A protein has these predicted regions:
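Loop/turn-to-beta-strand initiation segments
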Residues: 1-2, 72-76, 152-153
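Glycine-rich, flexible N-terminal cofactor/catalytic loop recognition
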Residues: 1-55
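Beta-strand/loop-alpha-helix module characteristic of Rossmann-like adenine-cofactor folds
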Residues: 5, 114-157
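Short active-site oxyanion
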Residues: 23-29, 102-104, 153-154
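Conserved helicase motor
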Residues: 51-60, 132-137
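Short phosphate-binding loop-to-helix
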Residues: 55-70, 89
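Short glycine-cluster motifs
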Residues: 71-130
Length: 157
């Protein structure tokens, strides 16, 4: 079983009881940065083994994690903050699990763009999450111009 576990954004207390329980009971926690995740795990006295799973090892580590999942191991996927699979390499292992009929359970929690949307005070019945803006000035300016012409609320990082 693959558990997609949302983790706190900034405040370690912003985690669900269910997330703590899952992190304590799985066989392995796959995290973007084991050093960062260790802070959360230490705070809650969680001693589950961890392994790194990040942008540059997602293909090889993804195959390794898939092998463990097919052997019946339970793995929790966490990102450094927020919900795995949103603008991080988590989508890759989730996709592998879906393609290989691995059972997936989502443990909800913080997602930065939802917080931004709600706190904006803008209408939320129709919105676009545009992800990260381009780094280059001209591309960023062009993207902002395009987004400003939309008729609904836009959230981006």
């Amino acid at each position: 079983m693959l558990y997609i576990v949302a983790t706190p954004i900034g405040n370690l207390k912003d985690i669900t009881l269910r997330a703590v329980e899952v992190l304590r009971t799985v066989d392995l926690i796959a995290c973007e940065d084991t050093r960062h995740t260790k802070i959360l795990l230490d705070h809650y006295g969680i001693t589950t083994p961890t392994t790194s799973y990040f942008q540059h090892n997602r293909f090889t580590k993804g195959e390794y994690l898939l092998k463990l999942l097919t052997q019946g191991k339970s793995i929790a996927l966490v990102s450094d903050a927020g919900t795995p699979g949103i603008l991080d390499p988590g989508y890759h292992i989730i996709n592998l699990a879906v393609k290989n009929n691995i059972e997936i359970t989502f443990i909800p929690g913080p997602t930065a763009f939802v917080n931004a949307l709600v706190l904006s005070g803008k209408p939320s019945h129709e919105f676009l999450f545009a992800g990260f803006l381009p780094n280059r000035k001209l591309a960023r300016r062009n993207q902002l111009k395009r987004l400003s012409e939309l008729k609904y609320t836009v959230v981006f990082y």
